[in-house]
Amino acid sequence: MSEKKWNLREKDSCRWDLVSLGEVMLRLDPGDFRVATARQFHVFEGGGEYNVARGLKRCFGLNTAVVTALADNSIGRLVEDLMYQGGVDQSHVRWVKYDGVGRTVRNGLNFTERGFGVRAAAGCSDRGYTAVSQLAAGQIDWQKIFAQEGSRWFHTGGIFAALSATTPEVAAEAMDAARRHGTWISYDLNYRESLWKANGGKQQATRVNRELVRNVDVLIGNEEDFTAALGFEVENTDEHLSQLEIDSYRRMIERVVSEFPNVKIVGTTLRNARTASANDWSAIAWHDGKLYGSIERPGLEIYDRIGGGDSFCSGLIYGLLTDHDLQWAVECGAAHGALAMTTPGDVSMATLADVERVMKGGGARVAR
């Protein structure tokens, strides 16, 4: 029997390949219009942490579950119905009684326009008092998830941690349980200034994220995430952090893993948005002192950029869960992210065959 590369829990002993913890919102997409001028919206489900579980299930065929909470009303049931299409198991969704008007509990709404040309993508979230933001330690049976059912991987991120004062405690509780049972943990820093603004600001974001990262095996984040969420500096970037030198990123990673030696792998996408419709796109990942880079895709045509990073994350994790080397995994993540941005919504509509074709350099000729 050949030696495994990543020392993950055996698939046969686990019900889940991955369990994700995070908010699932209802995304309202105005199509080619602006949010403020639209007269109709198309709906999708989405959330930074959930999108990873959905990609692994829908595109890559793995068994995944989501831990979240929803207000039990028609909007929550619409989100549930959308999640059914993605195939992510909902047995650990916590349903909260609705008060009839949303004074005490609600479901999150995310109005997002895709952008085009010189008009950037833009979002307007309505997510105060959501059911998931009120999750508290002790409400989820993590022992059941990681011991009785078993999960090879656990994923959460900085968006969930920023929702309230209690959500970091829930994330920490989940990580402790996952680690006790040998489950790998990934964390996407995903710094959102708007979420932290009323929750302690950048100082609190740094404190919370630094505590959580001490439990993490795979850390995902771009240069802004590492500076704002962890307090590290990336050299040789402009004030808007729009250009990233690979050598500077490598030096920053080395400082991160020196302070957090538990981190085995660090990954990020590299995006230079020439316009909303054309981005230079690639990805890199670090492990054991070496940096692995994907194929560069200059001027990649973008239909909807939202969720590209989450799809990179799910492709990367798929590579590791299937015991590929890190070069293959980062190529898989970059290809999946590129494909996810060719269709509307936060989540991928790609298949594994699509991803493998793009990884091999396949073009856009008609497949017959």
Q: What would you call each of these model-derived segments?
A:
Residues 1-36:
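Positively charged, low-complexity intrinsically disordered leader regions
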Residues 34-54:
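Short catalytic helix/loop segments, enriched in acidic residues and glycine
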Residues 44, 52-63, 85, 319-322:
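Alpha-helix C-terminal capping segments
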Residues 63-158, 355-368:
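Conserved N-terminal subdomain of the carbohydrate kinase-like
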Residues 64, 90, 185-187, 220:
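Hydrophobic beta-strand scaffold residues
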Residues 169-182, 207-215:
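Catalytic-core regions built around general acid/base machinery
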Residues 192-289:
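Conserved phosphate/ATP/ADP-binding segment of small-molecule kinases
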Residues 276, 292-362, 366-368:
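Conserved post-catalytic alpha-helical subdomain immediately downstream of the catalytic base
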